[in-house]
A protein has these predicted regions:
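Short beta-strand-centered segment that lines the nucleotide-binding/catalytic pocket of NTP-utilizing
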Residues: 94-105
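Catalytic cysteine-centered active loop of the rhodanese-like fold, especially the PTP/DSP P-loop
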Residues: 63-86
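C-terminal accessory "lid"/substrate-recognition subdomains
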Residues: 1-65, 90, 104-107, 111-119
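Post-Walker A helix-loop "phosphate-sensing" segment adjacent to the P-loop in P-loop NTPases
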Residues: 86-96
Length: 119
């Protein structure tokens, strides 16, 4: 990865029993993570940083930028934030793809398609 983000400082849905076995793509889990002011502040600053970096990487000839997002289990917070960045970049005309490397390594009982499934 070119950029690595650690989102373990965000509130963890794992400790909410009804969210424990749902991924960060499930709307109620996403809404929980996004309901905290710290999440909104982080997203604003993170999006601004990536928006600043993209044209600078392109100017240096970099045709691809890999952003890794991690948390404790790779199921809730990192998934939610990776999805948010995916949507932000896509909505701003960036050719973007997303992969959740660790989501199925967990005891996921409920998942959702995420933003990549949207047209």
């Amino acid at each position: 990865a070119d950029i690595v983000e650690d989102v373990r400082f965000l509130p963890n849905p794992y400790y909410i029993e009804e969210y424990r076995h749902k991924s960060g793509r499930v709307p109620c889990v996403r809404d929980y993570v996004e309901s905290f002011p710290i999440t909104q502040t982080y997203k604003e600053k993170w999006f601004d940083m990536i928006d600043f970096l993209l044209p600078n990487y392109e100017r240096e000839g970099k045709s691809q930028l890999v952003i890794a997002v991690g948390c404790t289990g790779g199921m809730h917070r990192s998934v939610c934030m990776a999805e948010a960045m995916y949507k932000h970049l896509r909505d701003n005309g960036v050719d973007v793809s997303i992969e959740h490397r660790d989501i199925q390594k967990n005891d996921v009982e409920e998942d959702a398609p995420g933003y990549e499934g949207e047209a």
